[in-house]
């Protein structure tokens, strides 16, 4: 059994025959050649499909969807076709993710502008939405103005409330005015008594 196998394989390796040569066709006709025909096919498939390319193709196909290598057997695919498929799929995935991300960001920005606008119109200043407004510079300025207004209102309320514990200014003012008026009446009355007291006492009005 071992003698007919060696002379049949020796010229195939030495001459570098292809699949279409009659020497390899004769291998398939013999009973012993049927065993070596898969070896000859694997010999010619090694340079066409490297294991690294097949692994990359399998990983990309698992991540993106149904694998093309399972639907179509390996020997029927050309080496250039497999490389182009492997290169196109990651590129398409990147483009899809890029365009999809941009689309989602645009929709988010469009939808996020409406709640911010409605809150500003209704006057809901304290309950700020987590979404940003249409422009990136206006909302911070608006929030700063609102915060400044709230601080001024709080300071004015504290200033007005600080007088509640103190005595009322009206009562204090009237007391001082009464004291001053009493002193002035005393001065006038003493002067009137001095000048007109000699002639007669007249009721001071």
From Swiss-Prot:
Subunit record text: Forms heterodimers with the anti-apoptotic proteins, Bcl-X(L), Bcl-2 and Bcl-W. Also binds protein S100A10. The Ser-113/Ser-137 phosphorylated form binds 14-3-3 proteins. Interacts with AKT1 and PIM3. Interacts with HIF3A (via C-terminus domain); the interaction reduces the binding between BAD and BAX. Interacts (via BH3 domain) with NOL3 (via CARD domain); preventing the association of BAD with BCL2. Interacts with GIMAP3/IAN4 and GIMAP5/IAN5.
Modified residues (Asymmetric dimethylarginine): 132, 134
Tissue distribution of the protein: Expressed in all tissues tested, including brain, liver, spleen and heart. In the brain, restricted to epithelial cells of the choroid plexus. Isoform alpha is the more abundant form.
PTM statement from Swiss-Prot or TrEMBL: Phosphorylated at one or more of Ser-113, Ser-137, Ser-156 and Ser-171 in response to survival stimuli, which blocks its pro-apoptotic activity. Phosphorylation on Ser-137 or Ser-113 promotes heterodimerization with 14-3-3 proteins. This interaction then facilitates the phosphorylation at Ser-156, a site within the BH3 motif, leading to the release of Bcl-X(L) and the promotion of cell survival. Ser-137 is the major site of AKT/PKB phosphorylation, Ser-156 the major site of protein kinase A (CAPK) phosphorylation.
Keywords: Apoptosis, Cytoplasm, Membrane, Methylation, Mitochondrion, Mitochondrion outer membrane, Phosphoprotein
Primary residence: mitochondrion
Entry's family note: Belongs to the Bcl-2 family.
Domain comment quoted from the record: Intact BH3 motif is required by BIK, BID, BAK, BAD and BAX for their pro-apoptotic activity and for their interaction with anti-apoptotic members of the Bcl-2 family.
Result after altering residue 137 to A: No heterodimerization with 14-3-3 proteins. No effect on heterodimerization with BCL2 nor with protein P11
Extent of Polar residues compositional bias: 85-98
Protein's name according to its UniProt entry: Bcl2-associated agonist of cell death
Residue spans of biased composition, Acidic residues class: 118-128
One annotated Gene Ontology cellular component of this protein: mitochondrial outer membrane
A Pfam cross-reference name: Bcl-2_BAD
């Amino acid at each position: 059994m071992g003698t007919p196998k060696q002379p049949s394989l020796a010229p195939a390796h030495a001459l570098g025959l292809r699949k279409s040569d009659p020497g390899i066709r004769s291998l398939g006709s013999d009973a012993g050649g049927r065993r070596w025909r898969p070896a000859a096919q694997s010999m010619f498939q090694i340079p066409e499909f490297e294991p690294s390319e097949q692994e990359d193709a399998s990983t990309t196909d698992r991540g993106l969807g149904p694998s093309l290598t399972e639907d179509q057997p390996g020997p029927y695919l050309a080496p250039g076709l497999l490389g182009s498929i492997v290169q196109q799929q990651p590129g398409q995935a990147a483009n899809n993710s890029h365009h999809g991300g941009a689309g989602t960001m645009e929709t988010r920005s469009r939808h996020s502008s409406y709640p911010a606008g409605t809150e500003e119109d209704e006057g809901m200043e304290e309950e700020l939405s987590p979404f940003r407004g249409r422009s990136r510079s206006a909302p911070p300025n608006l929030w700063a103005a609102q915060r400044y207004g709230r601080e001024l209102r709080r300071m004015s309320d504290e200033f007005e409330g600080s007088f509640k514990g103190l005595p009322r200014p009206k009562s204090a003012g009237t007391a001082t005015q009464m004291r001053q008026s009493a002193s002035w009446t005393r001065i006038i009355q003493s002067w009137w008594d001095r000048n007109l007291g000699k002639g007669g006492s007249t009721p001071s009005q």
